[in-house]
Amino acid sequence: MDSKERIDQLTDQLKEAGYRYYVLDDPTMEDYEYDRLYRELEELESAHPELARADSPTKRVGGEVLSQFEKVSHSVPLMSLQDVFSMEELNDFLEKTIAAEGNAEFSVEPKIDGLSVALEYVDGKFVRGATRGDGTVGEDVTENLKTIRSIPMTLTGAPSRLIVRGEVFMPKKSFEKLNLRQEELGKPLFANPRNAAAGSLRQLDPKIAAKRGLDIYVFNVQLADGVEFTGHTQSLE
């Protein structure tokens, strides 16, 4: 097996293992085996950089430290969600919606408390990710988003241009681990997982963001070229 074949084999193996671990929560490879194959891939790519694939797992971490985040205009505005604080408010919303729409159907989903972002794919490749900002203009945090293992770098069978919206969050275990490390270093503790997630995603050094254990929950299709949906539920499917 030549170097190119081995690089392709390792890339595919590690991508599949990462997908099963981070997305399906069904690991099929021991951590030590993953680390061993990852190091082998790093060494081969270092010796043959021209053979490294754009979707290689090693491309997730290692971007240069930024001096600042570039501003990004959202192709489709990321609207804010309206809160309700009582059953009366909820019933009022339901009554108004049914009166306006008739036999309305509702999609009920958990609300993840994190930082809203837009992920853009062109020809199946992840090209850019940005924070919500004011809904119209956000910040380019592509390099930090690449470190989140549950975000695929490539998609099969995707529209030529696809933009989805998700919520970046920090799982409780990652939050507890981060605060323990902060305490050991004599640094201030984070008040809650949401603050920790927001601060981690806005690190100018992607290597720091990569150590924070961030995750994402994608909940909306903002744009899908050539695809029409009859409703929100269908877009989720």
Question: Where are these predicted regions, by residue range?
Answer:
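RNA/tRNA-interacting regions in translation and RNA-turnover enzymes
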Residues: 1-237
